[in-house]
A protein has these predicted regions:
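Bacterial N-terminal signal peptides
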Residues: 14-24
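Formylglycine-dependent sulfatase
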Residues: 2-4, 20, 29-451, 455-458, ...
Length: 495
């Protein structure tokens, strides 16, 4: 297969958006796997509770983290399959959500920033909730499901997709109305992209996510006698890291540590991976640990709100016919490589939590190490619920075989993309410069190219280098592996 050798100007027109103009026959058609799963209640359809967290990585008890406490997600996983190697298609909220809610990669949606609406490029796309709506389901959104800027869009619809829903709710709490009280350890950055936190007095119910969870519980109660698709979009643990003080108290400062970063960590890797410039934003270690504590507090606070949802399903008698999907939108660095937040093509920024609980199917705790994509959520849910008129050009795969057997044979590789452009925080790039990173993750390796290799590349062997410290790109010993991974990457792009 010939390499992609477009120059960067052509890439802006071709690589980023070529899939928007391509013939639909050239787009990878989903492999439909017929589902023989039915709800426990005869003729009634499955309900769906779709839970999305914002900026959540896999540092959680439910993913075997020894520190971060998630008792309600721990309970959920007892009758679910958790995917330990699930990856987003873009490590940034807007592009990622547009991708998994439409079932198309960012190359196809054309969403590579926080300003573009996928409808601008795909006006006829049928989103996941919209398909449920067309199949007679009650569809509703609470909070952030499609993209919304945080904190500025809290209490507003943001970049919501109105035709996907029957009802929508935009909760707002003191995490927004009193955000002027947050402690910002990176004061040159606005709170939505800063390391900042606030431990509040008072109850959970004063906060946006608790208000939203209460609304979602009410919606479940009111619509329990009809098939529903209810999406609860939590704003936490996105910055500012705000939660009641009791959740901060779960994490004594002596438990909060930072990952070690070798002095030569950035010597042999493309500079375009670096989102945090300078390293750790020049913030002292104690302040970084305080911010990380706030992130953990936000996770435990969010988990408590999930507990309300699970309890309501049980109390209303619909738990045994409701599929629950829990996921994040992208990963999150907490000091890995001296970096914070998302917007990089590393493991911590592309790996996302994903849990599927399906009554009658995932009755026991299951854990899958197979590599899956967020794109797989759409075709999996649509087939589990036997929906009609599923788009035939979805780019994900049906996860049913892994829900039936988490260790089943699976030819999976995850594709992610990131467009790096200069801004007032990215000081190493020239005005007008663009760097397009594309990566593929297999069970053992990650292979990344920046501008088709013109601006460098990366190859990591996680079997011997789980922390991505040794870039093997163009290493003669890995020549064959690199070529195979490059071909896998290009096949993903062509689809």
């Amino acid at each position: 297969m010939r390499p992609f050798n477009f120059n960067i100007q052509k890439k802006a027109q071709v690589i980023l958006f070529s899939m928007l103009m391509c013939n639909h026959g050239n787009v990878f058609a989903q492999e439909k796997v017929a589902s023989n799963v039915t709800s426990n209640d005869g003729n009634k359809k499955y309900n769906v509770l779709f839970i999305v967290a914002d900026d959540l990585n896999c540092d959680m008890g439910c993913f075997d983290d020894p520190i971060v406490k998630t008792p309600n997600l721990d309970k959920l996983r007892q009758h679910a399959v958790r995917f330990n190697n699930s990856y987003c298609q873009y490590p940034f909220s807007g592009p990622s959500r547009a991708s998994f809610l439409t079932g198309y990669t960012p190359d196809r949606t054309g969403v590579l920033d926080l300003k573009t609406n996928f409808r601008d490029n795909l006006p006829a796309a049928v989103t996941l909730p919209e398909l449920y709506k067309k199949n007679g389901y009650y569809t509703a959104r609470v909070g952030k499901v499609f993209h919304a800027n945080v904190p500025n869009d809290i209490g507003k619809p943001g970049m919501d997709d109105p035709q996907s829903w029957i009802d929508t709710y935009n909760p707002i709490g003191i995490d927004r109305t009193e955000e002027d009280k947050v402690i910002n350890v990176t004061p040159d950055r606005p709170v939505g992209s800063a390391l900042c936190y606030m431990a509040t007095d008072g109850s959970d119910d004063e906060h946006t996510d608790a208000i939203g969870a209460n609304i979602a519980c009410t919606m479940i109660k009111k619509n329990k006698n009809k098939p529903f698709f209810i999406a609860m979009g939590f704003y936490r643990p996105h910055s500012p890291y705000v939660a009641p003080k009791k959740y901060f108290d779960l994490y004594p400062m002596d438990q909060i540590t930072l990952p070690e970063v070798p002095e030569d960590d950035w010597v042999n890797r493309p500079i375009y991976e670096r989102f945090t410039d300078p390293i750790n934003w020049g913030v002292e270690e104690t302040k970084l640990r305080e911010a990380k504590r706030g992130y953990y507090a936000g996770i435990s606070f969010m988990d408590a709100q999930i507990g309300k949802l699970l309890k309501t399903l049980e109390e209303e008698g619909v738990a045994d016919k409701t599929i629950i999907v829990f996921c994040g939108d992208n990963g999150y660095n907490l000091g890995q490589h001296g970096m914070w937040k998302k917007q990089a093509l590393f493991e911590h920024t592309t790996r996302t939590p994903l849990i599927f609980s399906v009554p009658g199917l995932t009755n026991n705790e299951g854990k899958s190490s197979r590599v899956v994509e967020m794109l797989d959520i759409y075709p999996t849910l649509a087939n589990l619920c036997n929906l009609k008129n599923i788009p035939q050009d979805l780019q994900g795969k049906n996860l049913l075989p892994l829900l039936q057997n988490p260790d089943a044979a699976w030819d999976g590789a995850a594709y992610s993309v990131l467009l790096r452009t200069p801004n007032r925080f990215i000081k190493y790039m020239k005005k007008g410069e663009r760097a397009l990173g594309r990566t593929i993750r297999t069970e053992r390796y990650r292979y990344t190219e920046w501008n088709d290799g013109e601006k460098g590349g990366e190859l990591y062997d996680y079997q011997v280098d789980p922390n991505e410290n040794d870039n093997l790109y163009n290493n003669p010993k890995y020549k064959k592996i690199q070529k195979e991974l490059q071909e896998k990457l290009y096949r993903k792009i062509e689809k």
